[in-house]
Regions:
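Hydrophobic ligand-binding cavity/cleft-lining segments
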Residues: 18-66
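Beta-strand/loop substructures that line and gate deep hydrophobic ligand-binding cavities in soluble
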Residues: 110-160
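Hydrophobic pocket/interface hotspot
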Residues: 45-48, 79, 94, 105, ...
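Short beta-edge strand/loop motif at the mouth of beta-sheet-based domains
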Residues: 52-91, 100
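Positively charged n-region of N-terminal signal peptides that target proteins for export
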Residues: 1-4
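Short, highly charged C-terminal tails/helix-capping segments
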Residues: 168-179
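Hydrophobic/aromatic beta-strand elements that line small-molecule binding cavities or substrate pockets
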Residues: 34-36, 90-96, 119-127
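Bacterial N-terminal signal peptides
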Residues: 6-17
C-alpha cells in the first residue's frame, strides 16, 4: 500500500494537463477550475461522471486500480476506494446531488487528506444542445505545511487529467490514455 501511496503522490506532484487552470493560490488555500464540452446529453454525461471507476486513472489511487473506486451520488454518499486488505479510503463525501446537473463533494484528495484542510469539489453539467458542458471546481483551504504554491498546480494537473479522461470516455467510449 505504501508503494501505491508513494506512486499516487509522485503522480500528483508531477502531472500536468493543458486544460487545467489554477484560479487562485493564497496562504489560506487554492481554487481550481476546469471546463470541457462533451458530445452527450446531460443525462449521459451524469451517468458517466458517477461511474468513476470507468474513467479515473488508477495511477492516482491508493489501490492502483480504478475498478476499486465508486461514487454513491446521494447526500452522505461516498467517493470511496476499496483496498486489497479489506480496508478502504473515503476520498470525499457527497453533500449535494442533483442528477444530470450538479454533484458536490467535500474532502481532500490524496495527500491533502492527511493535512488540516477542507475541500469542496463541484461538478456541473450544463446543457449546451445538442450536447453538454462539464465544469469542475475544487476549492481547498486550511493549513498545509509548506503552503499551497507547489501542491495546487500538481492537484490541478491531476484533476485536469481526470476531466480529460471523463471527456474521452463520454465522446469515444474509452478514457484518454494516462499521461
Amino acid at each position: 500500500m505504501l508503494r501505491h501511496a508513494t506512486a499516487y503522490l509522485a503522480g500528483l506532484l508531477f502531472a500536468l494537463t493543458a486544460a487545467a487552470e489554477v484560479v487562485d493560490i493564497t496562504p489560506a488555500g487554492f481554487l481550481l477550475k476546469h471546463e470541457v464540452a462533451v458530445n452527450a446529453a446531460p443525462d449521459a454525461a451524469w451517468k458517466a461522471l458517477v461511474d468513476v471507476a470507468s474513467w479515473w486513472n488508477g495511477d492516482h489511487s491508493y489501490s492502483g486500480n480504478a475498478a476499486n473506486m465508486s461514487i454513491d451520488a446521494r447526500p452522505g454518499g461516498c467517493f470511496c476506494e476499496k483496498l486489497a486488505n479489506g480496508g478502504g479510503v473515503s476520498h470525499m463525501t457527497v453533500v449535494f446531488a442533483s442528477p444530470n446537473t450538479v454533484l458536490r463533494m467535500t474532502g481532500g484528495l490524496g495527500p491533502l487528506q492527511g493535512s488540516g484542510l477542507a475541500g469542496s469539489m463541484t461538478w456541473r453539467i450544463i446543457p449546451a444542445p445538442p450536447a453538454a458542458k462539464i465544469e469542475v471546481s475544487y476549492s481547498v483551504g486550511g493549513y498545509m505545511q509548506g503552503g499551497f504554491d507547489k501542491i495546487a498546480p500538481a492537484v490541478n494537473g491531476v484533476l485536469g487529467e481526470q476531466l480529460n479522461r471523463l471527456k474521452s470516455l463520454i465522446d469515444t467510449g474509452r478514457p484518454a490514455a494516462p499521461k
